[in-house]
């Protein structure tokens, strides 16, 4: 928690502002309400989705950390896949191989899989020109239609946290159902969500620890080459909140927000 601020309404209701590096919340009794400001709401059709699925080009054992695909085209640079009942996280893509696999993720059991077994991917690529998001930001989608398979409209039209940034125009999320269970795209998920998708981006998240503005080792792990320098901007500063009340109204502001 980065900031706590208590105040009382004119009717005597007691509130507590709870500001973290990710969210702005109000606590009333046992009820926590998300009041994080919206930074940007897109026009309909600005946001598109892409899901991927493929097959194994050869069999793998329960300990293999390289997953060979028939084709890796369109697979995110890192992500989460499912083969049979096993969930696997992978760290990178090389040729048609998923590299650095962590087997038996999400409490599943690592297993042997055969050539041509389906490889389903939960990591969706989102395209939105000049989205302005940073890693760990939150965005709520609405107006999306099914991609055609497991990635239904219900899966898409909810709040998501940005998993990884690809560039200024795209990023990835991990598909889930409304109970936060991972959902994996299948071969029928070939759509893009339709022309009515709207993305409501919340205020950029901040850092939870202080780092110097320039130097080495201050970026996200794995974000650049070893020993490369980086710098901070207003979108990745230490999150500091200012909060006060005007009567019963809460006034708040995030550093750099």
Regions found by a protein language model. Name each.
Residues 12-19, 248-253:
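Short beta-strand elements that form the blades of beta-propeller/WD-repeat-like
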Residues 7, 27-29, 93:
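Hydrophobic/aromatic beta-strand positions that recur at structurally equivalent sites within the blades
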Residues 2-9, 236-242:
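Repeated scaffold domains used in trafficking and secretory/extracellular systems
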Residues 15-40:
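Beta-propeller domains
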Residues 21-25, 88, 256-257:
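Loop/turn residues immediately N-terminal
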